[in-house]
């Protein structure tokens, strides 16, 4: 089956949404489970990250609905779409930081691609939102 531009655009948006949710969950997981000498600083940083990311998820869902798209809304769908690897273990604090840095860079790239597609589609309001999400991830990468 061949996809048209809208299909690719819509799939990219859903992938970004699922990846953003997975990223927020990972940051929250690390916030809850961080241990070690830098616990206070990392506990606070991870909370800041997941709050910054999670704050945009509802708006992102509303943006998708404005395009008449249904948002992925189950862990099964998230796992099928996300580009952020799940973390089933509790890594050491250095690995937590490294993972979130790498994932934040990945998310900035995902949002950049979606931004460009939104601009090409004339969805300038959504493009602005996606640029803001990209900036948040650049801050943490």
Predicted regions: what they are:
Residues 1-16, 93:
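Disorder-to-helix initiation segments
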Residues 2-8, 23-48, 110-125:
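Helix-loop segments that flank and shape redox-cofactor active sites
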Residues 12, 58, 62, 81-132:
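Acidic/histidine-rich alpha-helical segments that form the ligand environment
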Residues 19, 65-73, 103-106, 110:
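Alpha-helix capping/hinge segments and adjacent helical runs
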Residues 38-77:
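Conserved alpha-helical segments that form or flank metal/cofactor-binding pockets of metalloenzymes
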């Amino acid at each position: 089956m061949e996809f048209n531009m809208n299909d690719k655009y819509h799939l990219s948006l859903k992938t970004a949404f699922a990846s953003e949710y997975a990223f927020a969950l990972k940051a929250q997981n690390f916030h809850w489970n961080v241990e070690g000498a830098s616990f206070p600083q990392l506990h606070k940083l991870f909370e800041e990250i997941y709050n910054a990311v999670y704050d945009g998820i509802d708006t992102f869902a509303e943006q998708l609905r404005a395009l008449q798209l249904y948002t992925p809304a189950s862990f099964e769908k998230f796992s099928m779409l996300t580009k952020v690897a799940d973390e089933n273990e509790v890594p050491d604090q250095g690995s937590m930081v490294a993972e979130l840095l790498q994932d934040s860079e990945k998310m900035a790239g995902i949002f950049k691609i979606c931004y460009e597609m939104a601009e090409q589609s004339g969805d300038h309001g959504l493009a602005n939102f996606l640029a803001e999400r990209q900036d948040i991830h650049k801050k943490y990468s």
